[in-house]
Amino acid sequence: MLPFLFFSTLFSSIFTEAQKQYWVCNSSDASISYTYCDKMQYPISINVNPCIELKRSKGLLHIFYIPRRDLKQLYFNLYITVNTMNLPKRKEVICRGSDDDYSFCRALKGETVNTTISFSFKGIKFSKGKYKCVVEAISGSPEEMLFCLEFVILHQPNSN
């Protein structure tokens, strides 16, 4: 009995359940999905229309989220990995508290954020490979993590 308890305790962290993967979209050259990287797994819905093509693509990013805190001060910590190379951490301030670019920056705790943001990759050339981006959303004073998502983009450019 003692060996069973010992080994089950020792190996319990090795045999953990896999994270549920949420599919965002597929395009002719990319596949995009995400998983939660925190234990909260606070519901968020992300949609891209049209799906990202990493060759001079533009489109709309749709986000549906009910924040657990006011979004007067919001920033993202971005941890990006290209294939196996880790890029330096990037802090992207989204909401400063005044003169903000996005309407959701004034959203209060519990209010629905249902927003659409345009994007463009014009002039950026992405190499073939696996891109990972961990996004930590931090808000408030004192700072608190709202959510953490790990995006995976598999880029397989067409040889045409």
Swiss-Prot record:
Disulfide bonds join 25-51, 37-148, 95-105. GO terms for molecular function: coreceptor activity; lipopolysaccharide binding; lipopolysaccharide immune receptor activity; Toll-like receptor 4 binding. This is Lymphocyte antigen 96. N-glycosylated; high-mannose. InterPro entries: Ig_E-set, LY96, ML_dom. Its main location: secreted. Glycans are attached at residues 26, 114. Residues 1-18 form the signal peptide. GO terms for cellular component: endosome membrane; extracellular region; lipopolysaccharide receptor complex; plasma membrane; receptor complex. Residues 119-123 are annotated as: Interaction with lipopolysaccharide.
